[in-house]
Design a protein with these regions (language model features):
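Flexible hinge motifs at transmembrane-helix junctions and intramembrane kinks/re-entrant loops
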Residues: 42-45, 57-75, 81, 85, ...
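Generic alpha-helical transmembrane segments of integral inner-membrane proteins
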Residues: 22-26, 52, 56-59, 78, ...
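Re-entrant/interfacial helical elements at transmembrane boundaries that shape
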Residues: 172-186, 200, 213-231, 319, ...
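Hydrophobic alpha-helical transmembrane segments
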Residues: 18, 22, 51-52, 74, ...
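Juxtamembrane and boundary regions of transmembrane helices in multi-pass small-molecule transporters
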Residues: 2-39, 126, 132-135, 191-224, ...
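Structural signature of hydrophobic alpha-helical transmembrane segments
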Residues: 42-52, 113-122, 171-175, 248-254, ...
Length: 490
């Protein structure tokens, strides 16, 4: 009998999950029913207390993984709709606002179609079209040629190309694609040499770091991008191109640094590599459509602010063009990572609940955030994010930390100037999440690379910790510098 069927029949795995879920439920109910004075927040309403309980539920479910991370996000939206919205049960609404400000149910459900979600969908559709047409293979072949045959240069080429692809294409898809390209290369390398380890490690490192380069590179970026640009919140007007302007140089620097570290720890014994990238490129009009649309979309993302077109609107371009030209079919839509989309939506809903019910405002007024040391907040938030993201989804980590830190930053006000302002803290979370890559479970690219059997967990931990902590330190230093020079705000 297959092992997975045995696990299901035995119930051992599910019993553990059930116990964790039950504990989470009990703690949530406890927080839900605590006396309001317990929280120490002046003016706290019943509705706001419910939001705190829902937030506690989200934290525990994401940390324990009692249910899948995307299911937690759906649960958040479900509980918000039924318990704190204007469409919840009447006995939960009270009469004439006696329980506090209720959320607009339409606004909660709109989190599934938030403009930033559309931005992500545009990125997913671009990736599907590039893979389907073979454009990704063509680009990889073209981009790797200048690096020649010298082993060290080939390694540099792969880590840079992986990083660049990960800015616009899912880092999971990028890692899978690039490792496929390396399969014939491994056959030519000594079985007991360190070159195989070096090349294999280059892929997840490149994919994880490269994701920092654009707002769509990884979900934590999208969270920070959304909060910083929210018209009802910080409204800083940071464009897609501005994000790339200060993050891409950081990414390139970290990729080159990672290349140097990998070479030092896992040097090649074979000095040259014969590289043959395998894959089909379809030479037809649809490939031309994909290529033109791909580059026009990227150009509009970069320069759209000057033309009056924002990044979210631009994301509809590839979706529409590929739909009416038949490049993307209904079946292709199944390839979109809907779990990630729903996870992001759940995080947005949490932020909406904290702001829409007035909880964030009351917390800012009642808790003396202004007395906190900005540097301590920056360091602790970064290290907590880095640590958590090594063990749980970095999307879940960002969804937990960014709403809290947004409130903290609003309460600290001008005192954050010493570290470059609120963007340093929030974008710093995105950086910390991307730098967390010490274990096979840390990120999907890590898991894919580990599954090849060419690297051991100790190899991944060694490179992941060194590159991750250096990336964290350098990334924060850069954010502080550009923040103090007012280069981030739109």
């Amino acid at each position: 009998m297959p092992e997975n069927i045995k696990n299901v029949l035995s119930g051992e795995f599910h019993i553990k999950k059930f116990v964790l879920f039950t504990i989470t439920l009990l703690i949530t109910v406890l927080v839900w029913n605590l006396p309001i004075d317990t929280f120490g927040i002046e003016g706290l309403t019943v509705v706001q207390q419910r939001v705190i309980a829902i937030f506690v539920m989200a934290v525990l479910l994401w940390l324990t993984e009692a249910i899948p991370a995307w299911a937690t996000s759906v649960t958040i939206i479900f509980v918000l709709l039924f318990c704190v919205s204007d469409s919840s049960f009447k006995f939960l609404q009270g009469s004439e606002g006696e329980y506090g400000q209720l959320l607009d149910s339409v606004g909660i459900m709109a989190c599934f179609a938030d403009p930033t979600i559309i931005l992500f969908l545009g990125g997913f559709v671009l990736a599907i079209a590039a893979t389907k047409s073979g454009l990704d293979v063509l680009m990889a072949k073209t981009m790797i040629k200048p690096f020649g045959k010298k082993s060290e240069n080939v390694l540099l080429g792969f880590i840079l190309i992986t990083g660049i692809f990960s800015m616009f294409i899912s880092n999971t898809a990028t890692a899978a694609m690039m490792l496929t390209f390396l399969t014939p290369v491994f056959k030519a390398l000594p079985a007991n040499g360190k070159g195989r380890i070096a090349l294999t490690m280059a892929i997840p490192i490149g994919a994880n770091l490269g994701g920092m380069g654009t707002p769509i590179g990884t979900p934590p970026n999208a969270f920070a991008f959304k909060v910083l640009n929210d018209p009802a919140g910080l409204d800083m007007g940071i464009s897609f191109g501005q994000w790339m302007m200060f993050m891409c140089p950081l990414v390139i620097f970290l990729l080159v640094l990672a290349w140097f570290i990998i070479l030092k720890i896992f040097p090649f014994t074979k000095k040259t590599i014969e590289l043959q990238i395998e894959g089909d490129v379809k030479h037809n009009w649809r490939t031309v459509v994909v290529a033109v649309t791909f580059f026009v979309t990227i150009l509009l993302w970069i320069f759209g602010k000057q033309l009056g077109v924002n990044a979210n609107t631009t994301a509809m371009l590839p979706i529409a063009v590929f739909a009416f030209t038949g490049v993307i079919t209904a079946k292709d839509l199944q390839m979109i990572d809907w779990a990630v989309i729903w996870m992001v939506a759940g995080g947005f809903a949490l932020g909406l609940a904290m702001n829409g019910t007035g909880l964030a405002e009351n917390a800012v007024k009642s808790i003396p955030f202004g007395q906190l040391n900005p540097i301590v907040i920056l360091v602790i938030s970064g290290l907590v994010c880095f640590a958590l993201s090594n063990f749980i989804s970095n999307t879940a980590t960002a969804a937990l930390l960014i709403p809290i830190l947004t409130v903290v930053c609003q309460g600290m006000g001008d005192s954050l100037g010493i570290i470059g302002g609120t963007p340093t803290v929030l974008i710093g979370i995105a950086v910390a999440a991307s730098c967390a890559m010490s274990l096979p479970i840390s990120t999907p690219p890590n898991a894919i690379a580990y599954s090849t059997g060419l690297i051991q967990q100790k190899d991944m931990a060694k490179i992941g910790v060194i590159v991750g902590l250096l990336g964290l330190a350098i990334g924060y230093a850069m954010l502080i510098c550009i923040g103090k020079m007012d280069m981030i705000a739109g």
